[in-house]
Amino acid sequence: TERGFLDCTSPPVTGPCRAGFKRYNYNTRTKQCEPFKYGGCKGNGNRYKSEQDCLDACSGF
């Protein structure tokens, strides 16, 4: 879907909050899901709780 495409191609966004959750972001250059720190608010759709969730959503982009 277009939403999935946009989610999987967006850069990681920590957001303004400071919670520091470990999340995964799909990197279109490396074709891998990579960990990053998520602050807990705002951000974008390219943010997954697990590497597997990220791969399930974004493999093939």
Curated annotation (Swiss-Prot):
GO biological process: envenomation resulting in negative regulation of voltage-gated potassium channel activity in another organism
GO cellular component terms listed in the entry, alphabetical order: extracellular space
Annotated Pfam families: Kunitz_BPTI
Subcellular localization: Secreted
PROSITE patterns named in the record: BPTI_KUNITZ_1, BPTI_KUNITZ_2
Chief location of this protein within or outside the cell: secreted
Domain BPTI/Kunitz inhibitor, chain residue ranges per copy: 8-58
Keyword Secreted recorded: yes
GO molecular function, one term: serine-type endopeptidase inhibitor activity
Reactive bond (site feature) positions: R18, A19
Domain of life, per lineage: Eukaryota
Keywords recorded for this protein, A-Z: Disulfide bond, Protease inhibitor, Secreted, Serine protease inhibitor
Disulfide bonds: C8-C58, C17-C41, C33-C54
Function statement: Inhibitor of trypsin and chymotrypsin.
Protein name (record): Proteinase inhibitor
Organism: Tachypleus tridentatus (Japanese horseshoe crab)
